[in-house]
């Protein structure tokens, strides 16, 4: 049963406003979701923060998020704080997210890390539909648990799926299953002693693989790599023993990308 009286829903649709910048065309949300009004930290790049007025996800919580980024919009979406998945007892919490990025639009989706508490069970499914000219930075950071309490990999199960389509053709699929009951999370093929994991996908972004690799190599305390996926798009996987190194790495890559995207003609 959902903690709230109904399924938690968030709808956001953007367009280009009269001043040529990205604005909110339409939005709708139910508890605990809220939206901050967009602000413009750089040129025509808008930033919108998604708010969740709650202590975190509980047993039975169901979230349905739909984001429609209009043509020519340049938008960065962030979250309010680290997301906590509490003890879900014998159930689970879930989120289904659908994102559409329109023609010549740019989306940088940069939420804070996800922290599964002891006995937490979370299912996440994200589908992103792109136009051939859309540009995307999408990331997730997963934490081993409440690291400061030495609560490492005590969660029940965490399963996230990311599907990216370009002109209705699949170009990327990620199926992350973390199940400490059946897998040694400290195995060298898993976290290998690290506690934080970054997954970052870049589609049609004006940054070279060599530049991303250089960012990774210059990041202290980070063990990671970048790969070229379908049609020369990029995927970064990285591990660290804290959130800050991964957040800094992600920000460095995003900054290099947006420097080109937001340049005035």
Swiss-Prot record:
It is found in: Cytoplasm. The keyword Coiled coil does not apply. The keyword Cytoplasm applies. InterPro entries: UreD. GO terms for cellular component: cytoplasm. Pfam families: UreD (PF01774). Its main location: cytoplasm. One of its GO terms (molecular function) is nickel cation binding. Belongs to the UreD family. UreH, UreF and UreG form a complex that acts as a GTP-hydrolysis-dependent molecular chaperone, activating the urease apoprotein by helping to assemble the nickel containing metallocenter of UreC. The UreE protein probably delivers the nickel. This is Urease accessory protein UreH. It comes from Helicobacter pylori (strain G27).
């Amino acid at each position: 049963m959902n903690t709230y009286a109904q399924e938690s829903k968030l709808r956001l649709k953007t367009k280009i406003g009269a001043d040529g910048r990205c604005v909110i065309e339409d939005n709708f949300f139910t508890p605990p979701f809220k939206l901050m009004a967009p602000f413009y930290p750089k040129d025509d790049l808008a930033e919108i923060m998604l708010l969740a007025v709650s202590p975190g996800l509980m047993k039975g919580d169901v979230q349905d998020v739909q984001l429609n980024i209009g043509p020519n919009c340049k938008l960065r979406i962030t979250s309010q704080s680290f997301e906590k998945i509490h003890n879900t007892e014998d159930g689970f919490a879930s989120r289904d997210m659908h994102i559409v990025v329109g023609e010549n639009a740019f989306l940088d989706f940069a939420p804070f890390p996800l922290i599964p508490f002891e006995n937490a069970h979370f299912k996440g499914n994200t589908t992103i539909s792109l136009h051939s000219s859309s540009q995307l930075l999408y990331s997730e950071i997963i934490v081993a648990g409440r690291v400061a309490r030495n609560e490492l990999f005590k969660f029940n199960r965490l399963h996230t799926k990311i599907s990216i389509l370009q002109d209705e053709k699949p170009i990327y699929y990620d199926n992350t299953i973390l199940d400490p009951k059946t897998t040694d999370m400290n195995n060298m093929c898993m976290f290998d002693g690290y506690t934080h994991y970054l997954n970052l996908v870049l589609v049609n972004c004006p940054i070279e693989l060599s530049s991303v690799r250089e960012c990774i190599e210059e990041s202290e305390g980070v063990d990671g790599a970048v790969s070229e996926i379908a049609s020369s798009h990029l995927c970064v996987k990285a591990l660290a023993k804290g959130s800050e190194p991964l957040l800094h790495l992600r920000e460095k890559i995003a900054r290099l990308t947006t420097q080109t995207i937001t340049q005035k003609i």
